[in-house]
Structures are given as structure tokens and as C-alpha cells.
Amino acid sequence: MALEYPEELKYLDSHEYLRVEGDTVVVGVTSYAVDQLGDIVFVSLPEEGDRINRGDSFGSIESVKAVEELYAPLSGTVLSVNTVAVEDPALIGSDPYGDGWLIKVRLADPADELGETMTAEEYRERVEG
């Protein structure tokens, strides 16, 4: 898969992306993370209605190479979990920015939550040098 970094998204050092939709944010893993992990075979995510706090583990992603904890990039309430990706984790690898998203979160405080993100160009420079 080609490494892509859609311009409309925000990116984090943890190789997660954020798609901001008002006070709701879609969280997923970047194509760079997918490339590093290899074939994804299992994902564990929180339940709808769970509260997540920035920096805390909210799940894990398992590939043929490793098991990685997923750390919350922001604080808020989980509005939706991508159950299709839970049932078919390979979807995260084949379409990370589309059908392979992980969770949707309502931000606890939108003004405070999005300050530590990078643009697509900044992220590309970070991971590709």
C-alpha cells in the first residue's frame, strides 16, 4: 500500500490521525503505522459510551509482527466503534482512512484537545525524513 496522508486530517506522533467533524473526531491509524505493523489480525476497542482520557490506553492492535497498545490522543466519550473493523481487522490495513477507522469520540473540550497535531506535510516530513 502506498503511504498516503490526506490533507484534511490531523496527525499525531503516535501515528494516529484525527478527522475533525465539529465536536466529534474520528480516530484511526495512519498508513505509515499500517506499513510498520504489517498484516493486522486483531483489534480491541472500547465500548460505545466509554470515556477515554488523553494518554490512556483505549485498546490494542495486533499484527503478525507485534501487539501495540492504542493510546487516546484526546479526551472524550466514545460515540461509535467500528465493529466492522473489529470483525475484519484487515480492513484497517487495506483502507485506514476510509472504512478502517477505529472510533468516533465527542471531545470533552474541543479548544484544548487539538493543539498537539501536525498537518499532513509535517507528518510526512516526520516519518519519511
Swiss-Prot record:
GO BP term (any one): glycine decarboxylation via glycine cleavage system
Cofactor remark from the record: Binds 1 lipoyl cofactor covalently.
Short name of one Pfam family: GCV_H
Domain Lipoyl-binding per the UniProt entry, residue ranges: 24-106
Sites bearing N6-lipoyllysine, chain numbering: K65
Cofactor(s), by name: (R)-lipoate
Keyword check for Signal: no
Protein keywords: Lipoyl
Disulfide bond positions: none
Cellular component GO terms held in the UniProt record: cytosol; glycine cleavage complex
Binding partners and assembly: The glycine cleavage system is composed of four proteins: P, T, L and H.
Entry function: The glycine cleavage system catalyzes the degradation of glycine. The H protein shuttles the methylamine group of glycine from the P protein to the T protein.
PANTHER family: GLYCINE CLEAVAGE SYSTEM H PROTEIN, GLYCINE CLEAVAGE SYSTEM H PROTEIN-RELATED
Family: Belongs to the GcvH family.
Protein name (record): Glycine cleavage system H protein
Protein source organism: Gloeobacter violaceus (strain ATCC 29082 / PCC 7421)
